[in-house]
């Protein structure tokens, strides 16, 4: 297979400003915001020639609803140790659902959080 199966992911939000603030502060990054009529998106940084899939926060009053159920997205902790990102979650309106837990020596660690919009999101790191 030459390409990843996942084209991109969308994380539903109710309040774009609040969601952007949450993700920028937890992951120490800048989202790229776009508005197309009633559809609003804020894209995570990504490079086309690197591994992983691009993703965006998305708001549309008719088509998207944040949820703790359903698909689970794993976001890479760019600090290298998801403990660093977990330290910021509650301070910016999120909740830790499952603390840092070892998956295995080979695959590293994961944690589950509830973001500022009510979405269940997983974090992953090798350390």
Whereabouts are the PLM-identified features?
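Domain-length accessory/inserted modules outside core catalytic folds
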Residues: 50, 62-68, 75-79
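Short beta->alpha transition motifs characteristic of CBS
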Residues: 104-107, 123-127
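Core segments of cupin and vicinal oxygen chelate
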Residues: 10-53
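Active-site beta-strand termini and strand-to-loop segments that position acidic
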Residues: 44-49, 113-116, 126
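N-terminal beta-strand motif that seeds the catalytic metal site of vicinal oxygen chelate
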Residues: 1-20, 70-73, 125-127
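Vicinal oxygen chelate
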Residues: 15-16, 73-117
């Amino acid at each position: 297979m030459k390409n990843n199966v996942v084209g991109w992911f969308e994380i539903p939000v109710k309040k774009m400003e609040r969601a952007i603030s949450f993700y920028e502060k937890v992951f120490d990054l800048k989202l790229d915001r776009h508005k197309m009529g009633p559809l609003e998106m804020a894209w995570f940084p990504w490079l086309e020639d690197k591994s992983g899939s691009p993703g965006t926060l998305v708001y549309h009053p008719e088509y998207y609803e944040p949820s703790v159920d359903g698909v689970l997205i794993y976001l890479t902790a760019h600090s290298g140790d998801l403990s660093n990102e977990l330290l910021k979650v509650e301070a910016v309106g999120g909740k830790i659902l499952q603390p840092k837990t070892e998956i295995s020596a080979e695959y590293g660690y994961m944690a589950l959080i509830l973001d500022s919009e009510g979405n269940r999101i997983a974090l992953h790191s090798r350390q």
